[in-house]
Amino acid sequence: MSTIILGLESSCDDTSAAVIKDGYLLSNVVSSQAVHEAYGGVVPELASRAHQQNIVPVVHEALKRAGVTKEELSAVAFTRGPGLMGSLLVGVSFAKGFARSLNIPMIDVNHLIGHVLAHFIKAEGEENQQPNYPFLCLLVSGGNSQIVLVKAYNDMEILGQTIDDAAGEAIDKCSKVMGLGYPGGPIIDKLARQGNPKAFTFSKPHIPGLDYSFSGLKTSFLYSLRDWMKDDPDFIEHHKVDLAASLEATIVDILMDKLRKAAKQYKINEVAVAGGVSANNGLRNSFREHAEKYGWKIFIPKFSYTTDNAAMIAITGYFKYLDQDFCSIELPAYSRVTL
């Protein structure tokens, strides 16, 4: 009998459902919320309401594209955290009702682990390389910046992490200061491709070990803009592509410096990147350069698997299903969860 997992993701502002059959992805439907753009960030109450409106049609579409009926499902995997509590509750509540009505198991998935395991998503007939355990994963998003030692799908160790702001958060805030809009990541990425990454210099943190810090960079960027704009009120408009390129290059250098140290310290040459910031062109290029220079075997996810999606939840749920690792229907959502 086939194992068919429905995955649900609702941790922030994307409602997503995916179906995996015997380890192969059949469908992955994502509904993003444009309502937040006018506010320059995600509004939790609006996100929760949008999830309530989207989750039923998204699940229906995922099952339809997969050619699967709900009665064929083996289990429901869902994001339990971390994330916005109101958003998480929509997915968790739907999963509970859905699983109970079908009398099938529930599988809780840590959103961060889902990002790491996105490298194991594959469609039938698709040729894609997957990392071998153990491997290193640079997990970078709006809320997290971590270097993770992945020993197994259910055995991960954080080697280093941000002590303040995440890389994605720093990018978004600097973008907002420049008046570029939200979300800042894709905007900075697009502008940076046209600019000179060495045009401006911003401070880099001196943090011991493998931990990160981005609050100092954010402050340096803000104060530099303030000083430059005293002489030229239109400084940002005149230099925005170079500002974006220099900011991106600084953040990528900070991320890769610690990752190099981790790879050398733990003697690992299989290195992956995951999370929303892994879509950044500068970071992806730096990974390729490191692969050539240091002999790394690198793993860069498809763009569709960098942002929040249910495919990563479904594949994690599939691995847990094989181990019969189910959760109680009473399990609550958790807004704060670590690896």
Model-derived regions: residue spans:
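Conserved phosphate-binding/catalytic loops in two-lobed NTP-binding clefts
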Residues: 108-109, 271, 288-313
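Glycine-rich phosphate-binding loop plus the immediately following alpha-helix
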Residues: 151-194, 219, 223-229
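N-terminal beta-alpha supersecondary unit
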Residues: 2-82
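Short Gly/Thr/Asp-enriched flexible loops that form oxyanion-binding sites at enzyme active sites
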Residues: 78-102, 121-122, 281-290
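Short beta-strand scaffold segments in enzyme catalytic cores
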Residues: 15-20, 137-139, 145-149
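Conserved phosphate-binding catalytic cores of ATP/NTP-utilizing and phosphoryl-transfer enzymes
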Residues: 1-2, 109-135, 316
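Glycine-rich phosphate-binding/hydrolytic loop that grips phosphoryl groups
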Residues: 115-117, 301-339
